[in-house]
Amino acid sequence: MWRAGSMSAELGVGCALRAVNERVQQAVALRPRDLPAIQPRLVAVSKTKPADMVIEAYGHGQRTFGENYVQELLEKASNPKILSLGPEIKWHFIGHLQKQNVNKLMAVPNLFVLETVDSVKLAGKVNSSWQKKGSPERLKVMVQINTSGEESKHGLPPSETIAIVEHINAKCPNLEFVGLMTIGSFGHDLSQGPNPDFQLLLSLREELCKKLNIPADQVELSMGMSVDFQHAIEVGSTNVRIGSMIFGERDYSKKPAPDKCAADVKAPLEVAQEH
């Protein structure tokens, strides 16, 4: 049986990247013409992988990378070799962010997008912390939506989407809202039709743009991982998060301690549902 990580293991990072990018373009060609013409961004998720693999992918043209844990991201982004050999690198944080880890995340070199804002309080904390950093640029943020309604997943209920975006735009001058993010239902059978989670995120963007008078091409959709990224792109994703197909299977015995406290019961999902 084909496995997501086998491509990288057999071909190496460079060949795996080329193969993934080819599949991205194949999916783009199948998108409906009425969708915003945004070239999908490939976020190479390097969690549990060494800095040398990030540098190798960078050497093959990859510039955007993602991490799930604040400590691991801070260590990699601060790595002298990555800083020296990857000056154009852009980091996306794609994991659950607890408020006590916000200041640490804001210290990450070359932090480009925070994809997982899931509350007004978190948005306020990030806004204040980024202001204290004194960056001349606003921090790009996405709002994470729990489109499936599963208790094991983080994210806002769909009904709260417009309210939090209004809050960010009106009350968080140091943040730039750039899109919506979701994790699709694991194991969705495409023979039954498109993933309803992806369709819901599309409809939320349409509603958001209509009510707040925002052009659709200014609201990205981050959805799709190694197992479903082509389908996600076909229905409108502009940002896919892919790890094992590029870097190979993960060894969780070497994974840094996750950014969680005893009360954070949702973190194990990341092991079951792979990027």
UniProtKB/Swiss-Prot annotation:
The modification Phosphoserine is found at S6, S226, S244. The modification Phosphotyrosine is found at Y69. The lineage of its organism: Eukaryota, Metazoa, Chordata, Craniata, Vertebrata. InterPro entries: Ala_racemase_N, PLP-binding_barrel, PyrdxlP_homeostasis. One of its GO terms (molecular function) is pyridoxal phosphate binding. Keywords: Phosphoprotein, Pyridoxal phosphate. It holds the Pfam family Ala_racemase_N. PROSITE patterns: UPF0001. This is Pyridoxal phosphate homeostasis protein. Belongs to the pyridoxal phosphate-binding protein YggS/PROSC family. The modification N6-succinyllysine is found at K125. The modification N6-(pyridoxal phosphate)lysine is found at K47. HAMAP family: PLP_homeostasis.
